[in-house]
Design a protein with these regions (language model features):
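Basic, Lys/Arg-enriched alpha-helical interface segments
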Residues: 1-68, 77-81, 88-91
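Hydrophobic/aromatic beta-strand elements that line small-molecule binding cavities or substrate pockets
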Residues: 71-73
Length: 91
């Protein structure tokens, strides 16, 4: 019998989703792909732990067409992923 993979739900803080929607389409696609990997229990190559914020808090960092985009997400004990911040890095 084939093994079924459990995909964690991804929830968004309202402000993070609003900011994410302003990202260019190409950047959104790549970042959503990285979030999908996290939801399936993996870690994308462009994701790294954010030290000092507790275990399970990670940042997805993307350089896209000369700009830098970030998503910060947390994996909760209830096996949920929460996107808590999305922003375009200015410097």
């Amino acid at each position: 019998m084939a093994e079924t993979r459990k995909t964690r739900p991804v929830s968004w803080i309202k402000a993070a989703l609003k900011d994410f929607r302003e990202f260019p389409e190409g950047a959104k696609g790549i970042l959503l792909g990285a979030l999908t990997i996290a939801a399936e229990g993996g870690k994308a190559d462009i994701a790294k732990p954010l030290h000092g914020l507790g275990s399970g808090v990670l940042e997805i960092a993307l350089a896209h067409r000369g700009d830098a985009f970030r998503i910060v997400y947390a994996i909760l004990l209830a096996d949920e992923i929460w996107v808590i911040h999305a922003f375009q890095k200015k410097s």
